[in-house]
């Protein structure tokens, strides 16, 4: 009977081989301290491909890439390869590279309309996440042209219109998609949101139109009131005086009646048809000013002066600005002349003066202490009508 045990010569050979293997390290293998880095250089086990593939550093990967993107392959195969590459970038949220890959796939101009529709739709999604909503919508339209019933393209188009605040269009796209799949959850959600926003937009538009109509009626009433009082107006940018009585205020300052001045006030009319003006008081001695947001036309100047100077303002260090000491003037800019205003005059009486002109719908008056040296010097050389 033959023995199954190896002959002594075979055992000796195996022992010699193992001793040699242990004493001489395996050349070309991974180093113990760098095995992870070396492992990551093998294409099959790479966690992430390098952005730039150097054939000398990554020869295996460069070889695979040349095989994958071989121009000798059919356009459909190349386009699909770029589509898959774009999908990988998309999953990594690298949307810029995804756009580039999908674009390369479209450049192949393959004859498969479904594949091209997918490339357009996928690129639209990447563009959307990059914030290029109009580019995304253009791609969706191209995909829809190739494949009208492409549901993903319709969903993306609805999202684009929603983002662009085209709420009615978003609803229409959703309705089109729901004809294909009436239970599509995403379309139902988009439609509900778009319809709600569309209704809000329509409501706001109605409110804006009502407000505009109300303001138009108010402006017409203001214009009629100004014209009836023969008050002269001049626009802020006008080079020459524009008389409201002769030229017609509607042609002069219709837009100005609807706008506030820099202080946030505007000309108004009450239920009795009486006007209240924003008025500016200027104190040239101290380069100071006061603004009255609503100076009623039937109120006297002295009434406002008493209220403003019941206590000395912080800039009146000499405490000389008392109502009984103050003189008020308006300027005739055309003639460079000043007209003194009686403190007992109402605003309307002054505005109806033949030489008083209201600039930018805000009457302005100069105020100074009549007995002060500054006032005498300031008025010196000027023609003053008292």
From Swiss-Prot:
Modified residues (Phosphoserine): 51, 244
Subcellular location: Nucleus; Nucleus, Nucleoplasm; Cytoplasm
Stored PROSITE patterns: TPR_REGION (PS50293)
Modified residues (N-acetylmethionine): 1
Superkingdom: Eukaryota
Principal subcellular localization: nucleus
Gene Ontology terms, MF aspect: Hsp90 protein binding
A GO cellular-component term linked to this record: nucleus
Signal peptide start and end residues: none
Residues of the site described as Essential for interaction with HSPA8: 152, 156
Tissue expression summary: Expressed at high levels in the heart, testis, kidney, brain and tongue. Expressed at low levels in the stomach, lung and liver.
Pfam families named in the record: Wheel (PF18972)
TPR repeat start-end pairs: 79-112, 117-150, 151-184
Keyword vocabulary terms for this entry: Acetylation, Antiviral defense, Cytoplasm, Immunity, Innate immunity, Nucleus, Phosphoprotein, Repeat, TPR repeat
Site feature (Essential for interaction with CDC6) residues: 77
Protein's GO biological process: defense response to virus; innate immune response
Biological function: May act as a co-chaperone for HSP90AB1.
The family this protein is said to belong to: Belongs to the TTC4 family.
Quaternary structure, from the entry: Interacts (via TPR repeats) with HSP90AB1. Interacts with HSPA8, CDC6 and TBK1. Interacts with isoform 1 and isoform 3 of MSL1.
PANTHER family: TETRATRICOPEPTIDE REPEAT PROTEIN 4 (PTHR46035:SF1)
Protein name (Swiss-Prot/TrEMBL): Tetratricopeptide repeat protein 4
Organism this protein belongs to: Mus musculus
């Amino acid at each position: 009977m033959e023995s199954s045990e190896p002959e002594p010569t075979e055992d000796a050979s195996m022992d010699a081989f193992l001793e040699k293997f242990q004493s001489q390290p395996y050349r070309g293998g991974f180093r113990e301290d760098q095995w992870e880095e070396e492992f990551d250089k093998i294409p099959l086990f790479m966690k992430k491909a390098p952005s730039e593939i150097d054939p000398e550093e990554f020869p295996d990967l460069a070889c695979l890439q040349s095989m994958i993107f071989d121009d000798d392959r059919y356009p459909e195969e190349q386009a699909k390869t770029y589509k898959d590459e774009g999908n990988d970038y998309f999953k990594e949220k690298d949307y810029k590279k995804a756009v580039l890959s999908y674009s390369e796939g479209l450049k192949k101009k393959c004859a498969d309309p479904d594949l091209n529709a997918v490339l357009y739709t996928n690129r639209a999604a990447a563009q959307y996440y990059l914030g290029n909503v109009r580019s995304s919508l253009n791609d969706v339209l191209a995909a829809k042209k190739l494949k009208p019933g492409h549901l993903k393209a319709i969903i993306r188009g609805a999202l684009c219109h929603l983002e662009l605040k085209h709420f009615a269009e978003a609803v229409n796209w959703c309705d089109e998609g729901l004809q294909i799949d009436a239970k599509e959850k995403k379309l139902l959600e988009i439609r509900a949101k778009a319809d709600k926003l569309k209704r809000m937009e329509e409501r706001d538009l109605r409110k804006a139109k009502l407000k505009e109509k109300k303001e138009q009626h108010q402006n017409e009433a203001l214009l009629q009131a100004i014209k009836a009082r023969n008050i002269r107006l001049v626009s802020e940018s006008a080079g020459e005086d524009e008389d409201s009585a002769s030229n017609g205020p509607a042609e002069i300052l219709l837009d100005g009646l609807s706008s506030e001045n820099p202080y946030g006030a505007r000309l108004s009319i009450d239920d009795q048809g009486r006007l209240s003006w924003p008025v500016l008081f200027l104190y040239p001695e101290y380069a100071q000013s006061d603004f009255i947001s609503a100076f009623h036309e039937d109120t006297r100047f002295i009434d406002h002066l008493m209220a403003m100077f019941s206590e000395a303002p912080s800039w009146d260090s000499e405490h000389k600005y008392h109502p009984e000491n103050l003189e008020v003037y308006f300027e005739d800019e055309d003639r460079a002349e000043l007209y003194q205003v009686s403190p007992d005059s109402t605003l309307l009486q002054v505005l109806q003066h033949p030489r008083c002109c209201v600039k930018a719908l805000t009457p302005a008056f100069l105020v100074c202490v009549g007995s002060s040296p500054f006032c005498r010097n300031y008025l010196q050389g000027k023609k003053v009508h008292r």
